[in-house]
């Protein structure tokens, strides 16, 4: 009995020494800890966002096989950008990448960009080929992207100057060849007749798929072409060497190539906004603005929704990843633990100038984060 009383006295003495318990103080301490945790999470997300933007810049250059961003000024872009129907349609119909994370659409598994449309502007020929004593338009160089993909369509676009009276125009496309013994320097590719009415000039397209395929098989035969568009009075209406006020009216080739996409599996994950207090691995919104980079060489989109992953991957949340959990249980010290990373990504379409001042319309894989998860 005396022993029990002694224990009670000791307990009471300890309570007196410890003093009264302030519940409000404990609540404030807990609140401060929570605030500190949220602040750390915000800082972590901001660092993750900055790293994601820098990674995107590196990935775009790498996937487009560019060592550095093309150095093309806005003035040069205004001169080179064709004022032509196919390009205007691409730009006008271009929609900022929508958040299509809910669908199960096809996506490309390849690392590098899959090209869909290439717009090639004329350049100076490697050969000094002259017809009638003066250089003739036009010579086109082709990138390896055309050579290693299936060409499904090739159109030559030419601009015809406006006429003052109704007239019939005879359009002729000639392929330049090495001079033959009889003096022949060209052979016909296409010819057509069309009626023009007074008003503005028009763009006319001509199918050149066959000659392009021949050029790709025998590059040495590509010496260029000559374009003629004569009206009834013998005036050449084709813009081959643009004069004053004719910027963007150069002839150009529109080449469409195709590649086969591959199907990938679907996954699910958490979606959060910037004000979310979610600590688990989650997908957060991120808009990449190319104009903010000074990347004027990207024609469209000027910005797109890239998104990024951030959050904790606690082992208590890993019933979905039993293999990772087992590894941690087997070797808790040697395992670095799972990371919050993209588990599904989708491509973006991009219209841009490459280093050779060619306009490319292509698909760049794995540029939009659709799902995040722990792995």
From Swiss-Prot:
Disulfide bonds join 272-282, 281-340, 309-372, 313-374. One of its GO terms (molecular function) is heparin binding. Residues 1-23 form the signal peptide. Changing residue 355 to D: Increases SMAD3 protein signal transduction. Gene3D superfamilies: 2.60.120.970, Cystine-knot cytokines. InterPro entries: Cystine-knot_cytokine, TGF-b_C, TGF-b_propeptide, TGF-beta-rel, TGFb_CS. Synthesized as large precursor molecule that undergoes proteolytic cleavage to generate an N-terminal propeptide and a disulfide linked C-terminal dimer, which is the biologically active molecule. The circulating form consists of a latent complex of the C-terminal dimer and other proteins, including its propeptide, which maintain the C-terminal dimer in a latent, inactive state. Ligand activation requires additional cleavage of the prodomain by a tolloid-like metalloproteinase. CDD domains: TGF_beta_GDF8. Homodimer; disulfide-linked. Interacts with WFIKKN2, leading to inhibit its activity. Interacts with FST3. It is linked to Muscle hypertrophy: A condition characterized by increased muscle bulk and strength. Affected individuals are exceptionally strong. This is Growth/differentiation factor 8. The gene is MSTN.
């Amino acid at each position: 009995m005396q022993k029990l009383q002694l224990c009670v006295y000791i307990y009471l003495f300890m309570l007196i020494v410890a003093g009264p318990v302030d519940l409000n103080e404990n609540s404030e301490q807990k609140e401060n800890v929570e605030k500190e945790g949220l602040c750390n999470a915000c800082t972590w997300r901001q660092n993750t966002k900055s790293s994601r933007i820098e990674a995107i810049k590196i990935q775009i250059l790498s996937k487009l096989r560019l060592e550095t961003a093309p150095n093309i000024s806005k003035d040069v872009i205004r001169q080179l950008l064709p004022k032509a129907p196919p390009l205007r349609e691409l730009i006008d119909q271009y929609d900022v990448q929508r958040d299509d994370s809910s669908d199960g659409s096809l996506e490309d598994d390849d690392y590098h960009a899959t090209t869909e449309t290439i717009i090639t502007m004329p350049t100076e020929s490697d050969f000094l080929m002259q017809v009638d004593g003066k250089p003739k338009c036009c010579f086109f160089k082709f990138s390896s992207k055309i050579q290693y993909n299936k060409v499904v369509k090739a159109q030559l676009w030419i601009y015809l100057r406006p006429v003052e009276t109704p007239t019939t125009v005879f359009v002729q496309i000639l392929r330049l060849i090495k001079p033959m013994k009889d003096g022949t320097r060209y052979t016909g590719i296409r010819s057509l007749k069309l009626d023009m009415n007074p008003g503005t000039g028009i763009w006319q397209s001509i199918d050149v798929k066959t000659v392009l395929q021949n050029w790709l098989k025998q590059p040495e035969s590509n010496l260029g072409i000559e374009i003629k568009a004569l009206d009834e009075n013998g005036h050449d209406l084709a813009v081959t060497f643009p004069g004053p006020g004719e910027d963007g009216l150069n002839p150009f080739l529109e080449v469409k190539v195709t590649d086969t996409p591959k199907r990938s599996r679907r996954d699910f994950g958490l979606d959060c906004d910037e004000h979310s207090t979610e600590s688990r691995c989650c997908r957060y919104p991120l808009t990449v603005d190319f104009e903010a980079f000074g990347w004027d060489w990207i024609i469209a989109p000027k910005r797109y929704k890239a998104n990024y992953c951030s959050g904790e991957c606690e082992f208590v949340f890993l019933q979905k990843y039993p293999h990772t959990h087992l590894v941690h249980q087997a070797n808790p010290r040697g395992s670095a633990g799972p990371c919050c990373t993209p588990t599904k990504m989708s491509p973006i379409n991009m219209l841009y100038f490459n280093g050779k001042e060619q306009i490319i319309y292509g698909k760049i894989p794995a540029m939009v984060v659709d799902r995040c998860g722990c792995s």
